[in-house]
């Protein structure tokens, strides 16, 4: 087996945002007019957050999600009737927006930006820049002027709200899809991968043992399984600022090398499984042998995860993903 992912449905492994942009680009390149919808704000309960996207054509074909399905159906029905002829417009669902007013089952309210794109060079170039941002390493901002209809893109820093509005300008931030690198297979690792996929992460499992990967491929069809040492994959550019790295094997030969490479990257989360005693020994070993600094070691969560009294592999995986979610959302551990 080589060091490429095991063969599987590549589309299933792609984050939904990337699927939306790729589908829109495909339709534009084939000469079809498209509509791109983006959730701008949500009030009360809402199944999808700001930045969620859906792309559609008048025939009803679509890709993406704005809600649990009710908004999508209503939008597609109205699109077929030609109700979204404007270059762009903001539509409110759930609170007296479109007539007849549509109440959402969850009781929430969503503001959705609806943009019409013609199959022309400027539209194709715009979608290509969005695709590049989603598969790349850097965040990109796209600004839409509601009055003039102009659309511009540019680089954006590592932090900031996904959607913002200033006067007639709406700014939407896109960037690398959240990624989880699982360093070595174990039962806990398999549960972590499963939960991460449910949270919308791109999951990459690196393990040098082909027999383990073959077994896991049936359990995790939407993860990328690569026969390679995790440290090698990371050293070759496997991490970006939206990446979390978890070492869950209890094998110091695998885990230590992974941690040594991970602290040299922009990964937002690095963690290793083990008891408090094991973790102290590991940190001492990394300091002595690998020359990690205090700052390097402070980036490593060990023991990994939140203290939830977890015992079973699934419970441990929940604590790991909960801690990753905490860090990603900027919540201090002391605030829990």
Feature roles, as predicted:
Residues 210-211, 231-233, 254:
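Short acidic loop-to-helix transition motifs that present clustered carboxylates
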Residues 73, 190, 253-256, 280, ...:
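Loop/helix-junction capping segments adjacent to catalytic residues or to phosphate/diphosphate-binding pockets
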Residues 2-226, 240-243, 278, 284-285, ...:
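Segments forming oxygen-rich coordination pockets for charged ligands
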Residues 230-241:
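Short amphipathic alpha-helix with an adjacent loop that forms part of the alpha/beta core around
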Residues 206, 244-245, 249-255, 260-285:
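ADP-ribose/adenylate-binding Rossmann-like module
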